[in-house]
Swiss-Prot record:
Main subcellular location: nucleus
Sequence segments annotated as region (Disordered): 331-379
Keyword Oxidoreductase included in the entry's annotation: no
UniProt modification remark: Phosphorylated. Phosphorylation upon DNA damage induces relocalization to the nuclear plasma.
Assembly: Interacts with PCNA. Three molecules of FEN1 bind to one PCNA trimer with each molecule binding to one PCNA monomer. PCNA stimulates the nuclease activity without altering cleavage specificity.
Protein residues bound to Mg(2+) 2: 180, 182, 234
Record's compositionally biased regions (Basic and acidic residues): 355-364
Cofactor-binding details, from the entry: Binds 2 magnesium ions per subunit. They probably participate in the reaction catalyzed by the enzyme. May bind an additional third magnesium ion after substrate binding.
Annotated region described as Interaction with PCNA, given as residue ranges: 336-344
UniProt protein name: Flap endonuclease 1
Function summary: Structure-specific nuclease with 5'-flap endonuclease and 5'-3' exonuclease activities involved in DNA replication and repair. During DNA replication, cleaves the 5'-overhanging flap structure that is generated by displacement synthesis when DNA polymerase encounters the 5'-end of a downstream Okazaki fragment. It enters the flap from the 5'-end and then tracks to cleave the flap base, leaving a nick for ligation. Also involved in the long patch base excision repair (LP-BER) pathway, by cleaving within the apurinic/apyrimidinic (AP) site-terminated flap.
Location of the region described as N-domain in the Swiss-Prot/TrEMBL record: 1-105
Length: 379
């Protein structure tokens, strides 16, 4: 879920903290990517038509491998150096949210069965996506693929978003890429949305600057964390009836959740019983992360290993894989040039910040009006 409604809240109240960037503008940049979020997107979109997905001869789904392979090559060809970060053990506080997701997926599975029985194609298309689950095997498959491609993998002790933020805070990477906004709450200095979108969508990358977020909202980092908890996060329920704008107003007025609770109209707003907001706050401020990782290296691809894994084990087209490997090798040579900023003083960016509602609304409408169709044969 991430932080409920945070993108719109920032677009309306902190537009200078957001700017649209071209995909190619991240040439030479090291970017930490939330792997689980990307895999989930690939399973939903790549090669899917209704209940049909890309599979190998054994009937095992390969959509995640197809998506990860192609999307990573696109990053490398643009001179971007991705670091994929995988989730570890979720914190206990997230178990309630995960249980809700499992319940919704079970409900969707039951509804999907009924839709199949009556032949409702629209319902099948919609419900089949709601039943998607990223498994441990999906993660292990992608880790193996990335290592064969010569792309670094980081296994987080807990939340991938928190680990990504820690890598960015400690200058291991330039920015964090995900679709969930949690990384901002964990303090990532720079956060990117839509970096992993397919090129066919033609949606610009949205870059968020956390320092400018705080400046625009006139909040401290502690207050921003409290704001995110009030908006709704993965760790605890929020106060019903308090949306983003009201939460921002209350934080500006009272400064903290404790002070808000002391002054809140209890007849109008129902506070969750035994509300663990303090523990949620602690998880954002003191997440379980590690910087004890091997040096991040982007190496030459293992050509034989890739052909064995993708072609022999998973039924990929050998000619396409061979050509893709050549793209990886060519991209590695290109990215070794590095950014000009390594040699010359950087100039000020010409990227314009978003206007308040107008640009945000136009971007949303443009995205809504375009549907992506993934290619690939069903097997």
């Amino acid at each position: 879920m991430g932080i409920k409604g945070l993108t719109k809240l920032l677009a309306d109240n902190a537009p200078k903290a957001m700017k649209e960037q071209k995909f190619e503008s991240y040439f030479g940049r090291k970017i930490a990517v939330d792997a689980s979020m990307s895999i989930y997107q690939f399973l939903i979109v790549v090669g899917r038509t209704g209940m049909e997905t890309l599979t190998n001869e054994a009937g095992e789904v390969t959509s995640h491998l197809q998506g990860m392979f192609n999307r990573t090559i696109r990053l490398l060809e643009a001179g971007i150096k991705p670091v994929y970060v995988f989730d570890g053990k979720p914190p206990d506080m997230k178990k309630q949210e995960l249980a809700k997701r499992y319940s919704k997926r079970d409900d969707a599975t039951k509804d999907l069965t009924e839709a199949v029985e009556v032949g409702d194609k629209d319902a099948i298309e919609k419900l089949s996506k709601r039943t998607v689950k990223v498994t441990r095997q999906h993660n292990e498959d992608c880790k193996r693929l990335l290592r064969l491609m010569g792309v670094p993998v980081v296994e987080a002790p807990s939340e991938a978003e928190a680990e990504c933020a820690a890598l960015c805070i400690n200058d291991k990477v330039f920015a964090v890429a995900s679709e969930d906004m949690d990384s901002l709450t964990f303090g990532a200095p720079r956060f990117l949305r839509h970096l992993m979108d397919p090129s066919s969508k033609k949606i610009p990358v949205m870059e968020f600057d956390v320092a400018k977020v705080l400046e625009e909202l006139e909040l401290t980092m502690d207050q921003f964390i409290d704001l995110c908890i009030l908006c709704g996060c993965d760790y605890c329920d929020s106060i019903k009836g308090i949306g983003g704008q009201t939460a921002l107003k209350l934080i500006r007025q009272h400064g903290s959740i404790e002070s808000i609770l002391e002054n809140l109209n209890k007849d109008r707003y129902q506070i969750p019983e035994d509300w663990p907001y303090q523990e949620a706050r602690r998880l954002f401020k003191e997440p379980n992360v590690t910087l004890d990782i091997p040096e991040l290296k982007w190496t030459a691809p293992d050509e034989e290993g890739l052909i064995s894994f993708l072609v022999k084990d998973n039924g990929f087209n050998e000619d396409r894989v061979t050509k893709a490997i050549e793209k990886i090798k060519s991209a590695k040579n290109k990215s070794s040039q590095g950014r000009l900023e390594s040699f010359f003083k950087p100039t000020a960016t010409t990227s314009a910040p978003l206007k308040r509602k107008e640009t945000s609304d136009k971007t949303s409408k443009a995205a809504a009006n375009k549907k992506t169709k993934a290619g690939g044969k069903k097997k």
